Amino acid sequence: MKRIIVPTVFILGVIGIFVLFLPREGFDIEIENQANRDISGLYLTYENIKKDIEIPTIMAGEKEEYQVSVKDNSSDNFEEAALKLVYEDNEGNQQTEYIIGYFEKGYYGEAKINILSVDEKGKLEIEVTENTKLF
């Protein structure tokens, strides 16, 4: 019995250490629409992104999750940036909300975006919680 338990514990320990120190990359973004209407026309972007990440319509009361891979989505010129949520209000003015204020290659983490309401001009009231780490 001891011959089985010791190797099993050792293997589980090695797997645990591997998972703990496994290189991570990118950001998990959750967008929750707490407003009383559907939200469309949003996209995520940053400096030297290959292609903006378009967010499909988020129904009232729903939430969506996205993975932003800096390695896969960035051009060769990428060094550092801020992740932004961009949309147009009812007057056609571009509105920008900063989701992650600073990151570069090797950063990872998560952000939660709560869309609380939409005013009569189409401007979103947004609450952002983010947590970023390096390596």
Give the role of each language-model region:
Residues 45-94:
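Extracytoplasmic/periplasmic/luminal assembly and interaction segments
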Residues 31, 43-44:
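Short amphipathic alpha-helical segments
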Residues 3-30, 86-135:
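Intrinsically disordered, low-complexity segments enriched in small/polar residues
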Residues 10, 14, 44-49:
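Structured catalytic/translocation cores of nucleotide/phosphate-coupled proteins
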Residues 22-24, 37, 78:
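Short, surface-exposed loop/turn motifs at beta-strand boundaries within globular domains
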Residues 1, 59, 69-71, 119, ...:
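Serine/threonine-rich low-complexity intrinsically disordered regions
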Residues 29-38:
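Asparagine-centered strand-capping/turn motif at beta-strand->loop junctions
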Residues 37-41, 95:
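Short acidic/proline- and small/hydrophobic-mixed sequence motifs that coincide with surface turns
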